[in-house]
């Protein structure tokens, strides 16, 4: 890749250069580590002091932050890339540099096993020990890295990337431009069992999981996340969703477009999460719920009922405290039931006294 100039990056991203548009940008780096040929960004005013002292060749800023820098008398003689949203501008420029470092190999490694009826486009790369079973469909420019598995009649969309040790089970669908990180499992059986009374107690009869797991376009799934196939209908992850590491998505779940789910969250079966939601790490959802669009759920929160009003923010985690204070509060919480009974007794007694006083006045 030819080294871009600051002016070229501005043109590509709808930004404005304040300074030298011919400055060559060789890479990106944090404010406190960037050198003279590197580009950094300021998206949080808390880091304004770092921006003022940074040795970066140029810094992406908002117009408002540049005015603050000018007020400090620090803007002159430096290079700034003024963008409407510095964080998004940084992300797009980072993508530009990342493309130059991507693996450009094509072809099928001789150690891969590809079923005879599968057509792999010449633009694809299939790594060593990859297994692609009969009836699978592989799109253009797909990259499937070592030891991954694509089951019978599964579909992988154009420009998707499957890192090492990814499994996409039979009949499942991965849309275009997906990124599946190592250890992801798409389409394992959902947790479906029918309880029956056997001679020694409850026995569980397996319910075959005959639905699929279907991922839309531009979905990214983090390492060791599992998205189970549906029992009869499909489990669906809509376009643009971003799912972090070690997330469990159970059977028949639907996650709406452009929702983000942070690590270690768990969504129980048949729950539907709306569009543009933000789900914090280790949040968990009971089954068969409906979660409205644009809902935010804080990390560690347990959602046990449906949320019907869009745009809400929900938190159920008790903030951390010094250990001794937490123990004292925990003791109070343990006694809440008895305390409630005492309060109710006092209320009844007060109501009785009030009624007696009223009678005597009459």
From Swiss-Prot:
It comes from the Bacteria. Pathway: Bacterial outer membrane biogenesis; LPS lipid A biosynthesis. It catalyses: a UDP-3-O-[(3R)-3-hydroxyacyl]-alpha-D-glucosamine + a (3R)-hydroxyacyl-[ACP] = a UDP-2-N,3-O-bis[(3R)-3-hydroxyacyl]-alpha-D-glucosamine + holo-[ACP] + H(+). One of its GO terms (biological process) is lipid A biosynthetic process. PROSITE patterns: HEXAPEP_TRANSFERASES. The lineage of its organism: Bacteria, Pseudomonadati, Pseudomonadota, Betaproteobacteria, Burkholderiales. The active site is at 251 (proton acceptor). One of its GO terms (cellular component) is membrane. Belongs to the transferase hexapeptide repeat family. LpxD subfamily. Keywords: Acyltransferase, Lipid A biosynthesis, Lipid biosynthesis, Lipid metabolism, Repeat, Transferase. SUPFAM superfamilies: Trimeric LpxA-like enzymes (SSF51161). Signal peptide: none annotated. It is an enzyme of class 2 (transferase). The gene is lpxD. Its EC number is 2.3.1.191. It comes from Cupriavidus pinatubonensis (strain JMP 134 / LMG 1197) (Cupriavidus necator (strain JMP 134)). Catalyzes the N-acylation of UDP-3-O-acylglucosamine using 3-hydroxyacyl-ACP as the acyl donor. Is involved in the biosynthesis of lipid A, a phosphorylated glycolipid that anchors the lipopolysaccharide to the outer membrane of the cell. GO terms for molecular function: N-acyltransferase activity. Homotrimer. CDD domains: LbH_LpxD (cd03352). This is UDP-3-O-acylglucosamine N-acyltransferase.
């Amino acid at each position: 890749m030819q080294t871009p100039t600051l002016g070229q990056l501005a043109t590509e991203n709808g930004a404005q250069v304040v300074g030298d548009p011919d400055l060559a940008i060789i890479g990106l780096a944090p404010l406190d580590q960037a050198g003279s040929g590197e580009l950094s960004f300021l998206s949080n005013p808390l880091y304004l002091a770092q921006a003022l002292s940074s040795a970066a060749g140029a810094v992406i800023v908002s117009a408002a932050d540049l005015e603050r820098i000018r007020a400090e008398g620090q803007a002159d003689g430096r290079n700034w890339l003024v963008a409407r949203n510095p964080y998004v501008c940084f992300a797009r420029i980072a993508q530009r540099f990342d493309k130059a470092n991507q693996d450009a190999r094509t072809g099928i490694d001789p150690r891969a096993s590809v079923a005879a009826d599968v057509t792999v486009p010449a633009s694809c790369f299939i790594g060593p020990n990859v297994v692609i079973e009969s009836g699978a469909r592989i799109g253009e420019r797909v990259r499937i890295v070592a030891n991954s598995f694509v089951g019978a009649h599964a579909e992988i969309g154009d420009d998707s990337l499957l890192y090492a040790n990814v499994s996409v089970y039979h009949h499942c669908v991965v849309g275009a431009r997906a990124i599946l990180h190592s250890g992801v499992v798409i389409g394992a059986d959902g947790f479906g069992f029918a309880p029956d009374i056997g001679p020694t107690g409850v026995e569980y009869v397996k319910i075959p999981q005959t639905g699929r797991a279907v991922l839309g376009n531009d979905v990214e799934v983090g390492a060791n996340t599992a998205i189970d196939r549906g029992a009869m209908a499909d489990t669906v992850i809509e376009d643009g969703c971003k799912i972090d590491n070690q997330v469990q998505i159970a059977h028949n779940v639907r996650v709406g477009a452009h929702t983000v789910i942070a690590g270690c969250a768990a969504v129980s079966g048949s729950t539907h999460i709306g569009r543009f939601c933000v789900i914090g790490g280790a949040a968990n959802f009971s089954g068969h719920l409906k979660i409205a669009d644009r809902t935010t759920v804080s990390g560690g929160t347990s959602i046990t009922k449906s949320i019907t009003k869009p745009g809400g923010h929900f938190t159920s985690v008790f903030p951390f405290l010094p250990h001794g204070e937490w123990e004292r509060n925990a003791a109070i919480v343990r006694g809440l039931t008895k305390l409630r009974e005492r309060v109710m007794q006092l209320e009844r007694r007060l109501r009785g006294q009030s009624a007696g006083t009223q009678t005597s006045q009459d």
